[in-house]
């Protein structure tokens, strides 16, 4: 139940961790909390220490450059709005996420989410589209009911109906949900 790899920073962790924590808070309001000791961390995994170290250095340099006056110097070399990966890159990309949940008594289980397609473009568009369709077509079966609303996360507001939709479009889920 362990992941035998080196860990390094993951570019989306800053946003994702906040979404997960907001979901936990929203579920707590419905008495469906993950538990009072819930924590969440996110990392990228690498096959070797060198790959993890290289990722750390590249991420660190990128953050420093983009948050300094050097940003103006590198901006002309960055992708412009509307530019992105080719259709072939979008089609041939993939993502593979493993989550390990550990209970207070030390019991662990693994949840796996994976799929084909560039996660930043193709998969994200699937996620957004299926969220919208879920709101329109599955409103009666959403967690909290039809009238539950506010500034929700996809997990708190759409729940299992969204998971079922995503499974039909190539976003695969394995393990306990």
Model-derived regions: residue spans:
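C-terminal catalytic/substrate-binding lobe primarily of soluble NAD(P)-dependent oxidoreductases
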Residues: 1-177
């Amino acid at each position: 139940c362990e992941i035998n790899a080196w860990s390094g920073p993951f570019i989306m962790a800053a946003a994702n961790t906040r979404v997960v924590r907001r979901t936990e808070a929203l579920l707590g309001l419905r008495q469906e909390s993950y538990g009072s000791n819930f924590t969440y961390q996110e990392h990228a995994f690498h096959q070797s220490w060198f790959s993890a170290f290289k990722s750390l250095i590249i991420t660190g340099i990128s953050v420093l450059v983009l948050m300094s006056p050097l940003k103006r110097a590198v901006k002309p070399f960055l992708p412009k709005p509307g530019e992105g990966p080719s259709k072939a890159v979008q089609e041939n990309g993939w993502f593979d996420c493993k989550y390990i949940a550990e209970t207070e008594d030390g019991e662990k289980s693994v949840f796996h989410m994976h799929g084909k397609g560039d996660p930043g473009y193709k998969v994200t568009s699937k996620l957004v589209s299926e969220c919208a369709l879920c709101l329109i077509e599955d409103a009666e079966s959403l967690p909290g009911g039809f009238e539950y609303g506010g500034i929700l996360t996809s997990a708190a507001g759409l729940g299992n109906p969204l998971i079922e939709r995503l499974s039909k479009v190539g976003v695969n889920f394995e393990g306990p949900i």
